[in-house]
């Protein structure tokens, strides 16, 4: 008697293209800037028996938890979708795990990676002093109700005063965002661009949905 085939269904997020940009950005932040030095990057040839997995990126979080981004390829081959790619976002701690959405994954990552405003910045802003810290992961605050202090610091950081337009800091951070994506897309081919210039005020991370190109 032929054994019945068992299926395992997991939630995934469809992406429109391959994952080279994601892999390049992770390797850049892990090996070049050291922002993700503790992150484990597992390429497809080291994954093992899971042939449909093209990569695994494991982010250690606080209190022994982890966030894992698994990249899938060759999905649903029985329908001919041989070029389909997707990612799965999983949070787990010990024996418990659950799948999360990109916005939740961003908030989990921001709790352990990429700098944000410190507690002393509000007092510095009130005294008219220069803001010394910046939020390098603004997409992690999407969907949250921001505090008045956070909104005030964002206004100071981005230079929105209603008359002078964009400040130098805001323009620089927009350049940093574009530069980070461009460096990932180019696979860090040019050593001068990727090693001789450092990202101002820490490394800016645009968020999982933007880097991966997750389709809604």
Curated annotation (Swiss-Prot):
Biased composition (Basic residues): 170-181
GO biological process, one term: viral life cycle
Descriptive protein name: Virion infectivity factor
Quaternary assembly: Homomultimer; in vitro and presumably in vivo. Interacts with viral Pr55Gag precursor and human APOBEC3G. The interaction between Vif and APOBEC3G is species-specific, which may play a role in restricting the replication of HIV to humans. Forms an E3 ligase complex by interacting with human CUL5 and elongin BC complex (ELOB and ELOC).
Domain notes: The BC-like-box motif mediates the interaction with elongin BC complex.
Something else known: Required for replication in 'nonpermissive' cells, including primary T-cells, macrophages and certain T-cell lines, but is dispensable for replication in 'permissive' cell lines, such as 293T cells. In nonpermissive cells, Vif-defective viruses can produce virions, but they fail to complete reverse transcription and cannot successfully infect new cells.
Record keywords, A-Z: AIDS, Host cell membrane, Host cytoplasm, Host membrane, Host-virus interaction, Membrane, Phosphoprotein, Ubl conjugation, Ubl conjugation pathway, Virion
Membrane topology: Peripheral membrane protein
PTM comment text: Highly phosphorylated on serine and threonine residues.
InterPro entries for the chain: Vif
Record's GO cellular component terms: host cell cytoplasm; host cell plasma membrane; membrane; virion component
Motif BC-box-like motif, residue range(s) on this chain: 147-156
Keyword Zinc: no
Entry-linked Pfam families: Vif
Membership in a protein family: Belongs to the primate lentivirus group Vif protein family.
Sequence positions bearing Phosphoserine: 147
Modified residues (Phosphothreonine): 98
Function per UniProt: Counteracts the innate antiviral activity of APOBEC3G. Forms a complex with host APOBEC3G thus preventing the entry of this lethally hypermutating enzyme into progeny virions. Functions as an adapter molecule, recruiting APOBEC3G to the ubiquitin-proteasome machinery. Targets APOBEC3G for degradation through the assembly with elongin BC complex, CUL5 and RBX1. Binds viral RNA and affects the stability of viral nucleoprotein core. May play a role in viral morphology.
Localization per Swiss-Prot or TrEMBL: Host cytoplasm; Host cell membrane; Virion
Region (Disordered): 159-181
Annotated region described as Multimerization, given as residue ranges: 154-168
Short motif HCCH motif, span: 110-141
Induction: Expressed late during infection in a Rev-dependent manner.
